[in-house]
A protein has these predicted regions:
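N-terminal, active-site-proximal structural segment of metallo-dependent hydrolase catalytic domains
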Residues: 1-155, 171, 263-264, 358-359
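Metal-dependent phosphoester-hydrolase catalytic domains
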Residues: 8-23, 28-40, 44-61, 70-73, ...
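Structured beta-strand-rich core segments of catalytic domains in phosphoester-bond hydrolases
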Residues: 77-98, 123-126, 130, 136-231, ...
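A fold-wide structural signal in alpha/beta-hydrolase
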Residues: 102, 210-212, 353-355
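Hydrophobic/aromatic beta-strand patches that form the interior of the parallel beta-sheet core
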Residues: 104, 164, 212, 279-281
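Acidic/histidine-rich helix-loop elements
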Residues: 105-122, 144, 220-255
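Active-site metal-binding loops of divalent metal-dependent hydrolases
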Residues: 106-108, 142, 216, 283-284, ...
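Active-site environment of divalent metal-dependent phosphoester hydrolases
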Residues: 110-115, 144-148, 169-173, 194, ...
Length: 359
């Protein structure tokens, strides 16, 4: 304390206490109902910022006055579940067992905005999928027309004998390509203008697997909204941040409330399934620290948390760097080597894949 003086020490400790409280609010925000409290439910988006601040306070107090480091340390310990979810570390990599299947989920951004697929210039999304060696592929923003037709997509993925395409609204759709028989495909009932979920039953090695492919409610941010956010990041003056924050938080909160109802519907479907294994995947349009992720993942394991490493950022544009694409597995299934694959840049999302085997 002698290095900074007693007065400033108490001031910094008070600020530290506020940062710990805010960290805990963010860490436990998935338990806040977005319908009742839409703004507060978005607190999880700020989790990494308050995590970094508390880590800095921890280091600072360890150097200046170790006794006060206990405050941030306790805050971090109480947030360990959220930290593990947001930034998993899996040092020991298990070998993929024989008989495991490779599962892949990808928001294709309309196959790179309906880029043509020709012999001399193949569509990079289709090339990636064709060479992925995945056994089951779930696609979001399956939008065709103009330069790329569904027939061409099916031909490019002709190694998959079983396929299903479902148009959600307008041109937007969801698709599934599988090496295993797709027994049925039904929409999950919930309100949405342009998004949706499809539940497939797939026969895999004698067992019936429930696969739920999701594209949950988007945040409806226009290009103007995204430009406001980019300007805030480039030049964060007080007026820009104040005006921009109100605009963005309002839209995020509104979308969060809609997704909450959708998440509840998916959770009911999963809870009522009495068959074999369950895989819930797709674009959740929400961070790992959210009501959506918690409710949809109730009773399931997050494949990336179980066998991935790092942030796993799957949305890659407009400075909104979050892991919003997921693969969740029932307790009788285990994931291996879950990867958010940033080697392909053809969409505003990166694909996420993992190997899946029975325990």
């Amino acid at each position: 304390m002698k290095y900074i003086g007693r007065f400033w020490g108490w001031i910094l400790l008070g600020i530290n206490l506020c940062m710990v409280v805010l960290l805990l609010v963010c860490a436990y925000s998935p338990y806040i109902d977005p319908v009742a409290h839409p703004v507060w439910s978005c607190a999880g988006l700020a989790f990494p910022a308050f995590l970094i601040v508390n880590l800095l306070f921890l280091v600072f107090w360890l150097v200046i006055y170790r006794k006060y480091a206990l405050l941030s340390f306790l805050g971090l310990v109480c947030s360990i579940g959220a930290i593990r979810t947001y930034f998993p570390v899996n040092v020991f990599v298990s070998d993929v067992p024989e008989g495991a299947i490779k599962f892949l989920s990808y928001n294709t951004m309309a196959f790179e905005k309906n880029r043509a697929n020709t012999k001399d210039n193949p569509n990079p999304v289709l090339e990636y999928l064709r060479n992925s060696n995945a056994d089951i592929i779930c696609l979001q923003e399956y939008i065709v027309g103009g330069r790329l037709t569904k027939k061409e997509v099916d031909y490019a993925l002709r190694d998959y004998p079983y396929k299903n395409y479902h148009k959600i609204s307008g041109a937007n759709g969801l698709g599934c390509y599988s090496r295993f028989p797709i027994l049925s495909a039904h929409p999950v009932k919930y309100a949405s203008l342009n998004n949706g979920s499809i539940a497939y039953k797939i026969k895999v090695n004698g067992d019936t697997l429930l696969v739920v492919n999701n594209h949950l409610e988007s945040n409806k941010l226009t290009e103007k909204d995204k430009e406001v956010y980019r300007e805030m990041m480039k030049d964060p003056d007080k007026q820009k941040v104040s005006q921009g924050s109100r605009l963005l938080i309002g839209k995020l909160a509104e979308a969060s409330a809609i997704r909450a109802v959708q998440a509840d519907s998916i959770a009911r479907l999963v809870a009522g399934y009495k068959g074999g294994g369950i895989i819930v995947c797709g674009d959740f349009n929400d961070s790992p620290i959210s009501y959506t992720h918690r409710v949809v993942g109730e009773g399931l394991n997050d494949a990336f948390v179980e066998s991935g490493n790092g942030f796993g950022i799957s949305y890659n544009q407009n400075h909104f760097y979050f892991r919003i694409d997921n693969i969740l597995l029932s307790k009788n299934l285990k994931s291996y080597r879950c990867t958010v694959d940033n080697t392909i840049k053809s969409s505003d999302h990166y694909p996420i894949w993992c190997y899946v085997a029975e325990k």
